[in-house]
C-alpha cells in the first residue's frame, strides 16, 4: 500500500496523470481490503470500492465527501479497459485535478489506517 502511494507520487511528479489516478485507485482498494481482512476473512475479488467498504462495515462510518470520493475514483480502474476508455478518462485529468486526487487518496488511506488501529 505504501509502495503504491510512493509510485503514485513518482508518476504525478513526472506528469503521468492517468497512471497516477490508477495507482490512487490501487491504494484505496488495497487499504480497504486490508481493513476487510482484519474484520472478516479474505476480501472478495472486487474492484468496487463502495461494495468493499460496505462489506467490511466502513461505508457507514464515512462522510459524504469520502463516499463521493469512492464513487469518483471508480473510473480510474483502467488496467483492463479499452484504449478509447482510457483516452476518455485521461482527457479529464491534469496537474490540478490529479493533485487533488492524490491528496484525497492520502487522506482516505490515512483515515482507513486510523480505523484499523481501532480494531
Where are these regions (language model features)?
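Terminal alpha-helical segments
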Residues: 1-119
